[in-house]
């Protein structure tokens, strides 16, 4: 009897508290002052009653367009924002947004639909200043599911995915095969949503990735041949983001799909 009851309690715990397993936010005090080498603006976007998402935007002189970046399941903008020069030095503004509960953003993530709805509100706010044809979506790790959703439901200039998965639920099932699939509420089905994406798509993935296997990137490429896939030898989950080879390659992709004003 105990052997039957214990798994039930474990599965119930995973179902109702899986956000704590998936999302690992680092909170920052409301009066925290970001410090970056580049000039930036701190912004706050109201996404729900009393819920504000905090972000930082870096602006370039050329103003070719803007990169809207969605980060992974850990950290906050105090670290992520340090990558801004990769885009600004090549003529693109970049906006880094925190999800609910991350950094100085209020609220908590409670569902996939809520996560994606918030992202759409952020995207819509950018449309007040930029044409959709000037918006580049950039996703890192779990953020690639958010970026892909927006690309599938809007008309951005292009979509750049780093450290990808074909379906987040599939990753969870790979990591915890003993847990029934219906327990997982966060599907984030990248493979399915890419079918509705019309803009250019680029994928960057470390071949030694132990979090999301490189096979996920290969699956996406096989199912969507027009994707430009770049695999990095001897790199893991996201450490290639700091490498010169990645920086050079992404500049090539940005120029290949250069925005026409």
Identify the residue ranges that each predicted region occupies.
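Short beta-strand/loop motif that positions the catalytic acidic residue
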Residues: 197, 203-205, 209
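Catalytic histidine-centered segment of alpha/beta-hydrolase-like enzymes
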Residues: 235-245
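Catalytic active-site module of serine/aspartate enzymes centered on a nucleophile-bearing elbow/loop
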Residues: 244-261
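Conserved alpha/beta-hydrolase "acid-adjacent" motif
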Residues: 210-216
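An N-terminal hydrophobic leader/cap segment in hydrolases
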Residues: 2-46
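Membrane-embedded segments
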Residues: 48-125
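Alpha/beta-hydrolase fold nucleophile elbow
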Residues: 130-141
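Hydrolase active-site cap/lid region
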Residues: 144-199
């Amino acid at each position: 009897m105990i052997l039957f009851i214990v798994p039930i309690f474990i599965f119930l715990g995973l179902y109702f508290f899986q956000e704590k397993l998936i999302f690992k936010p680092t909170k920052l005090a409301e009066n925290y002052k970001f410090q970056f080498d580049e000039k930036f603006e701190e912004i706050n976007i109201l996404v729900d009653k009393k819920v504000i998402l905090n972000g930082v935007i870096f602006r370039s002189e050329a103003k070719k367009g803007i990169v809207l970046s969605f980060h992974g399941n850990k950290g906050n903008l105090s670290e992520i924002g340090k990558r801004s020069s990769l885009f600004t030095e090549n003529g693109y503004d970049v906006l880094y947004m925190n999800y609910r509960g991350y950094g100085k953003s209020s609220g908590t993530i409670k569902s996939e639909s809520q996560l994606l709805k918030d992202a759409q509100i952020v995207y819509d706010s950018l449309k007040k200043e930029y044409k959709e044809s000037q918006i580049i979506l950039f996703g890192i790790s779990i953020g690639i599911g958010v970026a892909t959703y927006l690309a599938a439901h809007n008309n951005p200039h292009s979509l750049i995915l780093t450290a990808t998965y074909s379906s987040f639920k599939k990753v969870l099932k790979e990591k915890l095969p003993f847990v029934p699939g219906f327990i997982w509420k966060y599907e984030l089905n990248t493979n399915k949503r890419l079918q509705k994406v019309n803009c250019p798509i680029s994928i960057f993935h470390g071949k030694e990735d132990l979090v999301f296997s490189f096979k996920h990137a290969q699956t996406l490429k096989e199912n969507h041949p027009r994707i430009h896939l770049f695999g990095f030898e001897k790199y893991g989950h996201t450490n290639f983001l700091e490498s010169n080879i990645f920086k050079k390659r992404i500049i090539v992709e940005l120029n290949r799909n250069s925005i026409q004003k």
